[in-house]
């Protein structure tokens, strides 16, 4: 019987193992994320190219596949396409002058065509600065909003959370704060995460109309952009801020808002079949925000002396601050401004709930004169809120309690502020001095706004007040001449309301 002979060599296929270390194959596509085989040398957050033209970033590594997020929305990617890793991690392109730039996650200019080439780049993901390179927060970052600068002050290098329901004035506080930096030598970065394109355009137009784009950068992704782009956007904004801080600059960065950032990350991890945790968020939701916000610090003089002040925003539902993401970010930051919808609807703008809001380290950075004039304001407002409830029930109050109610009403009216009309440090000093020294007790609450406007108008017309404003950084307490000037201004206006 004849035996059949097989030539096994002709069935052998040579597998290039070295090639598989740097290359892979698209196995599955699912709503903006890719499951890929190969890529044995891949690292987390490494940039990749699909079919040599589509940009992606590695977001998931496990034994079965490599998970890639697509930066650009596209329907041109097919199963079987080649994937190759690049020689760098995901980064944002930078220009010599970042002022006035409106860019996306990778540093590409938005809303205008530009042939200008980037001069450098900065990685989106970096470690927190070492503890020995960080300095204390001792310099103020004035928002121009009386209730914040007096009761919950913010210092340069601080992380202060702004949280509240939808349409409670969070973005308006951020925009007012940016506009108030026009003469403060602070570079501002507004990071829009997954917002409507029309809303982003409206914010940009407001900044442009108030000449704030001259010292600002906008990093934006719209709701129509990919989930990966929305997830990466705050890190891109922080990378730009770090590049400016390394030049010794003071930077203010605003994240609008981190709730949408957490939602985008939740969607990505669920697509990668990662097990969900509380409220379906993944287990490392705390880490993605802490690793971002802890990069905002005040550096010591030996390491440039620059600072990053972060104002992250969180959207709450029905004023619930005990939800997963709000409690996470509250524990990461140095304080919070809690905005209440009912205050906003009653016309109390900015709608800051003083009883819940706190600034843990901002007091050390507050201007000493404002610190002295503000020391009992929180108590006055807290007592007013308690006694006001008794008045609502028709209970009679003694003379001392009625004085507390009167002071509370006056202070509440003083803290009301029109949008896009920030107050300078000396403006706030005049207002608080008038309140603390009893000059407003006979002014009806309905006329407080008019009194305040006329008071500032009279003050700005005096040469000695202008000189006081120019020198305020070097003045730590009011002299007799300053006190006399303030009382003359207040009494002149007071006679018109008596």
Swiss-Prot record:
F-type ATPases have 2 components, CF(1) - the catalytic core - and CF(0) - the membrane proton channel. CF(1) has five subunits: alpha(3), beta(3), gamma(1), delta(1), epsilon(1). CF(0) has three main subunits: a(1), b(2) and c(9-12). The alpha and beta chains form an alternating ring which encloses part of the gamma chain. CF(1) is attached to CF(0) by a central stalk formed by the gamma and epsilon chains, while a peripheral stalk is formed by the delta and b chains. It is found in: Cell membrane. The keyword Membrane applies. ATP binds at residues 164-171. One of its GO terms (cellular component) is proton-transporting ATP synthase complex. The gene is atpA1. This is ATP synthase subunit alpha 1. The record marks 357 as: Required for activity. Pfam families: ATP-synt_ab, ATP-synt_ab_C. Its EC number is 7.1.2.2.
């Amino acid at each position: 019987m004849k035996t059949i002979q097989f030539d096994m060599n002709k069935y052998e296929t040579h597998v290039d193992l070295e090639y598989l270390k740097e290359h892979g194959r698209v196995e599955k596509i699912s709503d903006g994320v890719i499951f890929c085989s190969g890529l044995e040398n891949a690292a987390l957050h490494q940039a990749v190219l699909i079919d040599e033209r589509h940009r992606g970033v590695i977001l998931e590594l496990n034994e079965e596949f490599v998970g890639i997020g697509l930066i650009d929305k596209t329907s041109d990617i097919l199963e079987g396409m080649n994937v190759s890793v690049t020689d760098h991690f995901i980064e944002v392109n930078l220009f010599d002058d970042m002022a006035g730039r409106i860019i996306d996650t990778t540093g590409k200019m938005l809303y205008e065509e530009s042939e200008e080439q980037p001069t450098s780049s900065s990685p989106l993901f970096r470690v927190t600065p070492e503890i020995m390179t960080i300095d204390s927060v001792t310099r103020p970052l004035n928002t121009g909003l009386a209730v914040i600068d007096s009761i919950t002050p913010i210092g340069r290098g601080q992380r202060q959370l702004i949280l509240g329901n939808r349409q409670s004035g969070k973005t308006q506080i951020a925009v007012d704060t940016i506009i108030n930096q026009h003469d403060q030598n602070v570079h501002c970065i507004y990071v829009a995460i997954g917002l409507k394109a029309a809303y982003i355009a409206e914010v940009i137009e407001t900044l442009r109309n108030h000449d704030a784009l001259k010292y600002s950068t906008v990093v934006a992704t719209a709701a129509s952009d990919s989930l990966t782009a929305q997830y990466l956007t705050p890190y891109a904004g922080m990378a730009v801020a770090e590049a400016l801080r390394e030049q010794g600059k003071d930077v203010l960065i605003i994240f609008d808002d981190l709730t949408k950032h957490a939602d985008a990350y939740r969607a990505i991890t669920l697509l990668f079949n990662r097990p969900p945790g509380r409220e379906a968020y993944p287990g490392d939701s705390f880490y993605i925000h802490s690793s971002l916000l802890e990069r905002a610090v005040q550096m010591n003089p030996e390491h440039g002396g620059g600072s990053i002040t972060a104002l992250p925003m969180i959207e709450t539902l029905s004023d619930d601050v005990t939800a997963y993401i709000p409690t996470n970010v509250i524990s990461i930051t140095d304080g919070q401004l809690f905005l209440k919808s009912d205050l906003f609807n009653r016309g109390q703008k900015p709608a800051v709930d003083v009883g819940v809001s706190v600034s843990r380290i901002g007091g050390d950075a507050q201007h000493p004169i404002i610190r002295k004039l503000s020391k009992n304001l929180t108590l006055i407002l807290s007592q007013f809120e308690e006694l006001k409830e008794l008045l609502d029930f028709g209970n009679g109050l003694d003379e001392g309690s009625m004085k507390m109610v009167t002071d509370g009403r006056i202070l509440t009216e003083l803290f009301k502020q029109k949008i896009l009309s920030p107050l300078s440090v000396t403006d706030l000093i005049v207002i608080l001095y008038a309140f603390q020294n009893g000059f407003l007790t006979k002014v009806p609450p309905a006329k407080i706004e008019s009194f305040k406007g006329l008071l500032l108008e009279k003050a700005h017309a005096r040469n000695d007040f202008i000189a006081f404003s120019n020198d305020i950084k070097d003045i730590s307490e009011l002299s007799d001449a300053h006190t006399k000037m303030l009382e003359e201004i207040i009494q002149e206006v007071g006679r018109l309301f008596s």
